[in-house]
Amino acid sequence: MTDLDPNLLFIKLGGSLITDKDQAESAKADIIFALLQEIRQQLQRDPSLKILIGHGSGSFGHHTARKFGTRQGVSTPEDWQGFQEVWLSARKLNQIVVYLAAKARLPVISFPPSAATFTANHIVQRWELTPMRNVLAHG
């Protein structure tokens, strides 16, 4: 697999599509499940595809991030506590997506961006993609 693999698709399930942004931590499970079923069906039609699925945080991470102001960066112990709260909230949505993927018989592995990206001034400086590339290379 190269960086320009024509069989690799990235599909982002937008946070405003899969959550109710007006209500904190409110997932639209029926929509998520339907989208994941569509993805599985596409993979069945074309087994050569490699699909990377991402999703936004919607009413999960964004509400918590606003509460703790983590967009301004983290440096103090209080900031890191806020960062942890945002991570926990975003992880809840990710667990819902992963659970629904399993229910749709779509095997997925989660790669949280917070574990692999390094930023400065809101710009990604480095993104460790080796684990993701290894999974994609092996099916």
Annotated model-derived regions:
Residues 12-13, 24-31, 43-45, 59-60, ...:
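Non-transmembrane, interaction-prone segments in cytosolic or luminal domains
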